[in-house]
Swiss-Prot record:
Protein family: Belongs to the Thz kinase family.
Alphabetic keyword roster: ATP-binding, Kinase, Magnesium, Metal-binding, Nucleotide-binding, Thiamine biosynthesis, Transferase
HAMAP family found in the cross-reference section: Thz_kinase
EC id: 2.7.1.50
Residues annotated to bind ATP: 125, 171
The species this protein was found in: Escherichia coli O81 (strain ED1a)
Function: Catalyzes the phosphorylation of the hydroxyl group of 4-methyl-5-beta-hydroxyethylthiazole (THZ).
The organism's place on the tree of life at top rank: Bacteria
Covalent S-S links between cysteines: none
Protein name: Hydroxyethylthiazole kinase
Positions bound to substrate: 50, 198
Pfam families membership: HK
Pathway annotation: Cofactor biosynthesis; thiamine diphosphate biosynthesis; 4-methyl-5-(2-phosphoethyl)-thiazole from 5-(2-hydroxyethyl)-4-methylthiazole: step 1/1
Length: 262
């Protein structure tokens, strides 16, 4: 199994495209991470919109550059709104990304996510346990936390990618991005990133935005993982703990985006 690495030049090019196109991302995400997710997108140069009302979700999915579906705080009204948005995104050819939070631990959301797969997401982003559960390989995970190493989920990610046509991202100490054939590994980051709520969910929003960019979608998505890991490393160097990490992380994302424009 060959795992390719992303070059700094590829990452910088994708970030330049990101800033140039400034995708409008329709984020149907969970209650815990909305502010952090929006600020992450803004720091990189995208435009977030948190539209969750069923009557509006379908309409907005048609005009957004990309759609994110994150099932972290799932409710029946949100299921209806998310379904409407995904159906409209499919009709409008709006790229959409699925973040199957805790899908390995809870049956209701697993069934819902499996139903959504029939609408062919552009990308799927989850930890190892979530990706393996969604692929039908195993059920597991401790709530939103993974109990599996990312590398162990690569075969499941490849299968899921081939079956759905999505680019699948497995995040962990090393992130892996695959279209079912190619695999790109992204190293870096810091364990402190797991002590802050929302870094993975925010990454899913950035992945969604990258699906709207021109060029190689797999490389663009892998670049999103790289930016987040880079920013995490920079932020940790300036932080004293989780509380000071968040503002430094947002600053680091902003600085990365400014550097490619210089």
């Amino acid at each position: 199994m060959q795992v390719d690495l992303l070059s700094s030049a590829q990452s910088a090019h994708a970030l330049h495209l990101f800033h140039q196109h400034s995708p409008l991302v329709h984020c149907m995400t969970n209650d815990v991470v909305q502010t952090f997710t929006a600020n992450t997108l803004l720091a990189l140069g995208a435009s977030p919109a948190m539209v969750i009302e069923t009557e509006e979700a379908s309409q907005f999915a048609a005009i957004a550059s990309a759609l994110l579906i994150n099932v972290g705080t799932l409710t029946q009204p949100r299921v209806q709104a998310m379904s409407a948005a995904v159906e409209q995104a499919t009709r409008s050819q709006t790229p959409w990304t699925l973040d199957p939070v805790a899908v390995g631990a809870l049956d209701y959301r697993r069934r819902f996510c499996v139903e959504l797969l029939s609408h062919k997401p552009t990308a799927i982003r989850g930890n190892a346990s979530e990706i393996m559960a969604l692929a039908g390989v195993a059920n597991g995970g401790r709530g939103v936390d993974t109990t599996d190493a990312a590398a162990n989920a690569i075969p499941a990610a490849q299968t899921l990618a081939r079956e759905t046509g999505a680019i699948v991202v497995v995040t962990g100490e090393v992130d892996y991005v695959t279209d079912g054939h190619r695999i790109v590994g992204i190293h870096g980051g810091n364990p402190l990133m797991t002590k802050v709520v929302g870094t993975g969910c925010a990454l899913s929003a950035v992945v969604a935005a990258c699906c709207a960019l021109p060029g190689d979608t797999l490389e663009n998505i892998a670049s999103a993982c790289h930016w987040m890991k880079q920013a995490g490393e920079r932020a940790v160097a300036r932080s004293e703990g989780p509380g000071s990490f968040v503002p430094h992380f947002l600053d680091a994302l902003w600085q990365l985006a400014q550097e490619v424009q210089a």
